[in-house]
């Protein structure tokens, strides 16, 4: 339960964002925190999408897992890069 800074980029956008997330946030919550900076601003919403998915080093993460749970499985430094995209 502590703030953790990440860099999030929505796939298709050219602007990465510094996003403060909590280690108790789920991956789905992190996706929303990143997407809010892009979807509806520089990219239109996708009406066929069922939500968002988060990629870390090209691997899709489980949306229900917390950041803390992911951090126990792999080394993660502040300002870690996360990609977010529409889930089809």
UniProtKB/Swiss-Prot annotation:
One of its GO terms (cellular component) is cytoplasm. One of its GO terms (molecular function) is alkene monooxygenase activity. Induction: Induced during growth on aliphatic alkenes (such as propylene, ethylene and 1-butylene), epoxides (such as propylene oxide and 1,2-epoxybutane) and chlorinated alkenes and epoxides (such as vinyl chloride, cis- and trans-1,2-dichloroethylene, 1-chloropropylene, 1,3-dichloropropylene, epichlorohydrin, and epifluorohydrin). Repressed during growth on other carbon sources. It is found in: Cytoplasm. It is an enzyme of class 1 (oxidoreductase). Its EC number is 1.14.13.69. Keywords: Cytoplasm, Monooxygenase, NAD, Oxidoreductase, Plasmid. Inhibited by propyne. It catalyses: propene + NADH + O2 + H(+) = 1,2-epoxypropane + NAD(+) + H2O. InterPro entries: TmoB-like_sf, Toluene_mOase_B. Component of the alkene monooxygenase multicomponent enzyme system which catalyzes the O2- and NADH-dependent epoxidation of short chain (C2 to C6) alkenes to their corresponding epoxides. Also able to catalyze the oxidation of a number of chlorinated alkenes, including trichloroethylene, cis- and trans-1,2-dichloroethylene, vinyl chloride, 1-chloropropylene, 1,3-dichloropropylene and 2,3-dichloropropylene. Belongs to the TmoB/XamoB family. The alkene monooxygenase multicomponent enzyme system is composed of an electron transfer component and a monooxygenase component interacting with the effector protein XamoD. The electron transfer component is composed of a ferredoxin reductase (XamoF) and a ferredoxin (XamoC), and the monooxygenase component is formed by a heterohexamer (dimer of heterotrimers) of two alpha subunits (XamoA), two beta subunits (XamoE) and two gamma subunits (XamoB). This is Alkene monooxygenase system, oxygenase component subunit gamma. It comes from Xanthobacter autotrophicus (strain ATCC BAA-1158 / Py2). The lineage of its organism: Bacteria, Pseudomonadati, Pseudomonadota, Alphaproteobacteria, Hyphomicrobiales.
